[in-house]
Amino acid sequence: MAKQDNSSSHENTLTEMQRYVTQEHGTEPPYSGKLLHNKDEGIYHCLICRAPLFLSDSKYDSGCGWPSFYQPFSPEAIRYLEDDSHGMQRVEIRCGSCDAHLGHVFPDGPQPTGERFCVNSASLSFTDDNGNKTLG
């Protein structure tokens, strides 16, 4: 999949942090995200294209400082890339629809998957079961 440039269509609506995270592969400071402590039932979407990424049922408190999920909404929801930046070997996760940076996945999550999808709040929007929307 070719990387799409999402910045131009959202240039005037993204905050500096949202742009930094989704377009420049940045990371928000730990414990700073608006959706970290969200416990409402609903769906987490890509902030850029609104594709569904995670269900609230798969969210858990990993203690890492970012929203954590043990599985994506669907296998196609997430794109995986090797990330050797900062002297570490990690797996970057991006939106499977628009290629926006989301965070990283680690093999230290709970069952049933054993995976921890560590996601920047700034890359997400959340819609609760009543249709109310919150931006990360």
UniProtKB/Swiss-Prot annotation:
The organism's place on the tree of life at top rank: Bacteria
Gene Ontology terms: cellular component: cytoplasm
Known cofactor(s): Zn(2+)
InterPro entries recorded: Met_Sox_Rdtase_MsrB, Met_Sox_Rdtase_MsrB_dom, Mss4-like_sf
GO biological process: protein repair; response to oxidative stress
PROSITE patterns, alphabetized: MSRB
Enzyme nomenclature, EC number: 1.8.4.12
Known catalytic reactions: L-methionyl-[protein] + [thioredoxin]-disulfide + H2O = L-methionyl-(R)-S-oxide-[protein] + [thioredoxin]-dithiol
Bound cofactor: record note: Binds 1 zinc ion per subunit. The zinc ion is important for the structural integrity of the protein.
Pfam families documented for this protein: SelR
All copies of domain MsrB, residue ranges: 7-129
Enzyme class: oxidoreductase
Binding site for Zn(2+): 46, 49, 95, 98
Molecular function terms from GO: peptide-methionine (R)-S-oxide reductase activity; zinc ion binding
Active site per database record: 118
Keyword presence, Oxidoreductase: yes
Keywords associated with the record: Metal-binding, Oxidoreductase, Zinc
Similarity field: Belongs to the MsrB Met sulfoxide reductase family.
Protein known as: Peptide methionine sulfoxide reductase MsrB
Lineage: Bacteria, Pseudomonadati, Pseudomonadota, Gammaproteobacteria, Enterobacterales
